[in-house]
From Swiss-Prot:
LRR repeats lie at residues 41-64, 67-90, 92-113, 114-136, 138-158, 159-181, 182-204, 206-226, 227-250. Widely expressed across tissues, with the most abundant expression in spleen, testes, thymus, intestine, and blood. Expressed in macrophages. Induction: Expression is inhibited by LPS. It is a single-pass membrane protein. Accessory protein that regulates signaling by multiple TLRs, acting as a broad-spanning regulator of the innate immune response. In macrophages, binds LPS and promotes proper docking of LPS in lipid raft membrane. May be required for lipid raft maintenance. Residues 330-345, 357-371, 385-418 have a biased composition (Basic and acidic residues). GO terms for biological process: membrane raft assembly; positive regulation of toll-like receptor signaling pathway. Residues 531-644 form the Calponin-homology (CH) domain. The keyword Cell membrane applies. SMART domains: CH, LRR_BAC, LRR_TYP. It comes from Mus musculus. Keywords: Cell membrane, Leucine-rich repeat, Membrane, Phosphoprotein, Repeat, Transmembrane, Transmembrane helix. This is Leucine-rich repeat and calponin homology domain-containing protein 4. The chain crosses the membrane at residues 655-675.
C-alpha cells in the first residue's frame, strides 16, 4: 500500500513547497514544514497542508512516508488548479477539504475514494458537478461560492447525504431529483437565482432550510408538512405568499399561514398528512453541527482569490476546516443507539404536529401556564386514595393526556368537585350533565368484576363491550347523592368516542377537542344548556349589548364574551377611554390566547370598578371566561348602573294580577258614573 501511494507522488514534476515558509515561522524552509506535516499525518491520521500557497502536492517529501491510513486531509487555502492525484489515491480518506483553491474542474480519480463522507469544494471556480461525485457515499457536500449553473440529475444517488450547501452559485432551479434525498437534514441554497422551489421539498425531513437572497415570490403550501424544521431563513426575497408582515413574525406564523392556505384551496390538512414521509429517527441539529450557530451573519465583504476574480463571501458556514468539521464521519462510525420506545406503543409517525403554534414556543407556554392557574394543582378523588400516574405519563403533553380514556373520569370528577365547592350558579346542572355523559358511555357495558374499596388496595376492573343476556346485571346509574365510583388506578369504560360525551364547561376540554360531531364550533357542543332564568338573562343581555354596540352578536353569547373584546368595547361605549388597551384577534391568529383573553376580562372588571359598580356585584375573571350566569349578570348590572337604559330582570309579582283587576274595575265605575251624569 505504501508503494501504491508513493508511486504517484514521485511520478514527476517540480516540488513547489521547497521555497515556501510556514506561516509564522519565516526562517523555516517549506520542505521542512511539509515534512513535519507528513510526520504528524502518519502519527494522527490527519493530513493538514492548509494555508501554504501550494500549487502542487509535495511529492518528494511524501515519498518516504506511509499515507495509506490517512482518514482526514485538509488542503484548503492553497492554489491547486486541480485536485492532486496523490490525494485521490488515499483510499482510506473519509474527509477532504479543498476549500479556497483555484479548481476549475475535478479529477475523475476522486471516484476511487470509496470511504469519503465529507467533501468541501467551496470557494473555487467550478461550473458543473460531475456525475462520479454523486457515486461517493457522501454525508456532507459543500460546493458554495462557485459558478454552478445547475445540479446534475444524478444527485438523487446520494442516498446518505445529510447536508448540502450550494449557496452563492448561479442556480436558476432545483432538480426534482433533489427531493428524493430522504436523509437530507440541511439544505442551503442561499444567494442564487432561484425563482421557485419544488413542492416535493415538503416531503424531506429537513431540520434547516436557507433559501434567502433569491427571487422566490411564493413558498409552496406543501412546506407545512416540514414537521422537523427548526431553522428557516428566507430574507431578501420578493415574497408575496405568505405576505411580508407574516414572514416578519417568524417561522410559526409562516407555517400557520401555509396550513390555513392549504385549507382555503380545498387541500384539507388531513389529505396532506398521509403524504408525509414514514416515521424515521430525526437527527438533531446539535448532533450534526456541534458548536455551530445558524446566525446567517455576513463577513467583511469581498474576498479575492489567486485567479483575480472577486465574489461575495457571505454566509460561508464552513470556511474553517477543523476537527469539528469531520463530526459527520464520526457519526458514521459511531451511530446513535436505538431510540427508547414509548410506553403506550405509539411511534413517531403517529404523532402529527398539525398546529405549529402549540409547541416549542416559550411565549405560548406562558399563555398556557397563565390559563392553568385557575386549576387545582392536584387531582382529588372521592373514593379514597388512588395511585398517582407514573412520571412518564406526566411527561406527556397535556392535550394528549386529556384525550386518554383512563384519565377522562379523573378530569370529570375534578370538575364536578370544583363546581360543588364554588357553589356557583349552574353547578347542579353540570353534575347532571356529567352523570348523563358517563351513564351514556357505559350503556353497553356490563358491571365490572371488582370494585375498589375505600380502605383496601386498588384493584383492576375489566369492562366487557356489549351486553350478554343473563350474564351480569347492568351497572345502576349513580344517584345525585353518591359519588362517582373509581375502580383501579385510573381505568374507566369508554365504549364510545370521547367527542360524543357531554363534558363540563371548562377550557381544558375546549382545548382538547379538535373537531365536533356537528358543523358548529366544538365549544358549543361542550357548553351545557342554560336554565330558563339563564336563557332570559342571556336574551335580555343580548338586546342591551346589540343596542349599545350597534352590531349583531353570535348565537353563543357566552362564548363571544369569553375573549373580553366585546366587554372592553362595551366599557368604552359606556365611558370613553375606560379601557385604554384591548387585545384583538389578528387575521393570522383568529383566536386569542388564554392569557390575552384574561387580560381583556380583567381590564373590563377594572373599568367597572372605576364606573362605580359595587365590588359585591362583580364576578371573578374565571366566571366571564367560562361564561357562567354570574358573569353575565355582572355585565348586565354594569350596563344598568352606568347606562340606565335596561331594566333589571325582575320576577313577576304575585299581587300584580289583583292590582290590574282593581284598576280595571275602578276605571269601569268611573265610566259608568260619568255616563249617568251626562244622561241626567
Amino acid at each position: 500500500m505504501a508503494a501504491a501511494v508513493a508511486g504517484p507522488l514521485a511520478a514527476g514534476g517540480e516540488e513547489a513547497a521547497a521555497s515556501v515558509s510556514l506561516p509564522g515561522s519565516p526562517g523555516l524552509p517549506g520542505s521542512r514544514s511539509a515534512e513535519r506535516a507528513l510526520e504528524e499525518a502518519v502519527a494522527t491520521g490527519t493530513l493538514n497542508l492548509s494555508n501554504r500557497r501550494l500549487k502542487h502536492f509535495p511529492r518528494g517529501a511524501a515519498r518516504s512516508y506511509d499515507l495509506s491510513d490517512i482518514t482526514q486531509a485538509d488542503l484548503s487555502r492553497n492554489r491547486f488548479p486541480e485536485v492532486p492525484e496523490a490525494a485521490c489515491q488515499l483510499v482510506s480518506l473519509e474527509g477532504l477539504s479543498l476549500y479556497h483553491n483555484c479548481l476549475k474542474c475535478l479529477n475523475p480519480a476522486l471516484g476511487n475514494l470509496t470511504a469519503l463522507t465529507y467533501l468541501n469544494l467551496s470557494r473555487n471556480q467550478l461550473s458543473s458537478l460531475p456525475p462520479y461525485i454523486c457515486q461517493l457515499p457522501l454525508r456532507v457536500l459543500i460546493i458554495s461560492n462557485n459558478k454552478l449553473g445547475a445540479l446534475p440529475p444524478d444527485i438523487s444517488t446520494l442516498g446518505s447525504l445529510r447536508q448540502l450547501d450550494v449557496s452563492s452559485n448561479e442556480l436558476q432551479s432545483l432538480p426534482v431529483e433533489l427531493c428524493s434525498l430522504r436523509s437530507l437534514r440541511d439544505l442551503n441554497v442561499r444567494r442564487n437565482q432561484l425563482s421557485t422551489l419544488p413542492d416535493e421539498l415538503g416531503d424531506l425531513p429537513l431540520v434547516r432550510l436557507d433559501f434567502s437572497c433569491n427571487r422566490i415570490s411564493r413558498i409552496p403550501v406543501s412546506f407545512c408538512r416540514l414537521r422537523h424544521l427548526q431553522v428557516v431563513l428566507l430574507d431578501s426575497n420578493p415574497l408575496q405568499s405568505p405576505p411580508a408582515q407574516i414572514c416578519l413574525k417568524g417561522k410559526l406564523h409562516i407555517f400557520k399561514y401555509l396550513t390555513m392556505e392549504a385549507g382555503r384551496r380545498g387541500a384539507a390538512l388531513g389529505d396532506l398528512v398521509p403524504s408525509r414521509p414514514p416515521s424515521f429517527s430525526p437527527c438533531p441539529a446539535e448532533d450534526l453541527f456541534p458548536g455551530r450557530r445558524y446566525d446567517g451573519g455576513l463577513d467583511s465583504g469581498f474576498h479575492s482569490v489567486d485567479s483575480g476574480s472577486k465574489r461575495w463571501s457571505g454566509n460561508e458556514s464552513t470556511d474553517d476546516f477543523s476537527e469539528l468539521s469531520f463530526r459527520i464521519s464520526e457519526l458514521a462510525r459511531d451511530p446513535r443507539g436505538p431510540r427508547q420506545p414509548r410506553e403506550d406503543g405509539a411511534g413517531d409517525g403517529d404523532l402529527e404536529q398539525i398546529d405549529f403554534i402549540d409547541s416549542h414556543v416559550p411565549g405560548e407556554d406562558e399563555d398556557r401556564s397563565a390559563a392553568e392557574e385557575q386549576l387545582p394543582s392536584e387531582l382529588s378523588l372521592v373514593a379514597g386514595d388512588v395511585e398517582k400516574p407514573s412520571s412518564s405519563r406526566r411527561e406527556e403533553p397535556a392535550g394528549e393526556e386529556r384525550r386518554r380514556p383512563d384519565t377522562l373520569q379523573l378530569w370529570q370528577e375534578r370538575e364536578r368537585k370544583q363546581q360543588q365547592q364554588s357553589g356557583g350558579w349552574g353547578s347542579p346542572r353540570k353534575d347532571s350533565v356529567l352523570k348523563r355523559g358517563i351513564r351514556a358511555a357505559g350503556a353497553g357495558a356490563s358491571a365490572p368484576s371488582t370494585q375498589a374499596t375505600c380502605n383496601g388496595p386498588p384493584k383492576s376492573s375489566t369492562t366487557q363491550l356489549g351486553v350478554s343476556g343473563g350474564q351480569g346485571a347492568p351497572t345502576p346509574p349513580p344517584t345525585s347523592q353518591d359519588p362517582l365510583p373509581v375502580s383501579g388506578p385510573v381505568t374507566a369504560p369508554v365504549p364510545r368516542p370521547l367527542g360524543s360525551i357531554q363534558r363540563p364547561n371548562s377550557f381544558l376540554f375546549r382545548s382538547s377537542s379538535q373537531s365536533g360531531s356537528s358543523p358548529s364550533s366544538p365549544e358549543s357542543v361542550l357548553r351545557p344548556r342554560p336554565f330558563p332564568q339563564e336563557k332570559e338573562l342571556i336574551s335580555q343581555l343580548r338586546q342591551v349589548l346589540e343596542s349599545r354596540l350597534q352590531q349583531p352578536l353570535p348565537e353563543d353569547l357566552a362564548e363571544a364574551l369569553a375573549n373580553g373584546v366585546l366587554l372592553c368595547q362595551l366599557a368604552n361605549q359606556l365611558r370613553p377611554r375606560s379601557v385604554p388597551f384591548i387585545h384583538v384577534p389578528s387575521p393570522a391568529v383568529p383566536k386569542l390566547s388564554a392569557l390575552k383573553s384574561r387580560k381583556n376580562v380583567e381590564s373590563f372588571l377594572e373599568a367597572c370598578r372605576k364606573m362605580g359598580v359595587p365590588e359585591a356585584d362583580l364576578c371573578s375573571p374565571s366566571d366571564l371566561l367560562r361564561g357562567t350566569a354570574q358573569g353575565l349578570q355582572t355585565v348586565l348590572e354594569a350596563v344598568i348602573l352606568v347606562g340606565g337604559k335596561a331594566p333589571l330582570p325582575v320576577q313577576p309579582s304575585s299581587g300584580l294580577g289583583g292590582f290590574l283587576l282593581f284598576y280595571v274595575v275602578f276605571m269601569l265605575l268611573l265610566y259608568v258614573v260619568y255616563t249617568r251624569l251626562l244622561g241626567s
